[in-house]
Amino acid sequence: MLRNKSQKELLHLSRQLIQPLLPNFHKGQAGKIVVIGGNEDYTGAPFFASHSAALVGADLSHVICEKAAGPVIKSYSPDLMIHPYLMDLDNPHLNLNNSELEKLKNLPIDEIIKTNDNAVLNKLIDELILPKVTSLLNRIDIVVVGPGFGRDPLMLKSLIRIIEEVKVLNLPIILDADSLYLVSLSPKIIANYPKAIITPNVVEFQRIAKALSIDVDLSESNKDKLIDQTIEVSRKLGDIIVFRKGEHDLIVKSSKFLINEITGSNKRVGGQGDTLTGAIATLVNWSNNYILRLWDNQVDLDQEDANLLACFAASSVVRNASSKAFNKYGRSMQTSNVHEYLHESFTELFGDSIFRTSNI
């Protein structure tokens, strides 16, 4: 249904996915999002992802982060709910002796990604981290993992265990940033999970493709070849959605694909990808609610097309907002400037749609 549609036609079709704000809805029905990531060094990434999800329209936006990052992210915005449940190996509450700590810090990455081969890490996660994380996951609609996660062994092992728990709970999950590093090392972490979306940039895509024995040339610009590569990655990962970021965003699920050619910003700055991930989370959740007829809507799309179209809509909002921010700020544009224009971009593309009750 979506193949060969123009950009304008795809935007028009996207309107039916925009969840209205009806008087009978209660808090949370427009989206309960959680972003899992953030450590002492990287606090901006999870903030931008969760803040974007909220600005695009999610009711409740949570962040699960490492303890040292919690107060910092809280200081950015009182609108987000911050849960400092994650721990790295420098956390004093771990009660590890120096020799144990040094051994864990020097663990080779291949040992970290093995499921059950490190009893010490798994014990720490089972006792101190996973119970709190799982308690929140049970109240969440969609999960984002990876922004600002870092490469600490305990953090990475926690990320693997959290992804496993998300799959057990059958929740939609978007993998970005450091979680894509894990996928490039062990694609089976997310392969064949139908509710997964990965959002690699050019370099991340090449790493994942290499892990799947697919050759990718970073200088490749032929559109058909880019599409074929992305289709092959999606298929080898079990037909999950691959959102390949670039000059034009390429959104693929098995043989289905959409290309977003809407003009974005001429400047690339840290955090824009996190903004996109948050927008994807809100809109994909709405597309799932659309399939469930949450607002007594007519359903003209299947699940795959609805999710692909939601990704296209999110890409459009962020690209349009980035273009507006760049037009105002030029070379000085930062990701926080993009956030200034998310609402304006959304309403420009999709209208207000607050009390809409039809698919028009």
Curated annotation (Swiss-Prot):
GO biological process: metabolite repair; nicotinamide nucleotide metabolic process
UniProt KW keywords: ATP-binding, Cytoplasm, Lyase, NAD, NADP, Nucleotide-binding, Phosphoprotein
InterPro entries assigned to the protein according to its UniProt record, in alphabetical order: Carbohydrate_kinase_pred_CS (IPR017953), CARKD (IPR000631), Ribokinase-like (IPR029056)
Residues the record lists as binding (6S)-NADPHX: G148, N201, V202, V203, E204, F205, Q206, R207, D274
Alphabetical list of Pfam families matching this protein: Carb_kinase
Family: Belongs to the NnrD/CARKD family.
Name of the featured protein: ATP-dependent (S)-NAD(P)H-hydrate dehydratase
Domain YjeF C-terminal intervals: 10-349
Protein task: Catalyzes the dehydration of the S-form of NAD(P)HX at the expense of ATP, which is converted to ADP. Together with NAD(P)HX epimerase, which catalyzes the epimerization of the S- and R-forms, the enzyme allows the repair of both epimers of NAD(P)HX, a damaged form of NAD(P)H that is a result of enzymatic or heat-dependent hydration.
Top-level taxon of origin: Eukaryota
Single GO MF descriptor: ATP binding
Residues engaged in binding ATP: 245-249, 264-273
Catalysed reactions listed for this entry: (6S)-NADHX + ATP = ADP + phosphate + NADH + H(+); (6S)-NADPHX + ATP = ADP + phosphate + NADPH + H(+)
Gene Ontology CC, one term: cytoplasm
Cofactor(s) of this protein: Mg(2+)
Compartments in which it is found: Cytoplasm
Record EC number: 4.2.1.93
HAMAP family, per the entry: NADHX_dehydratase
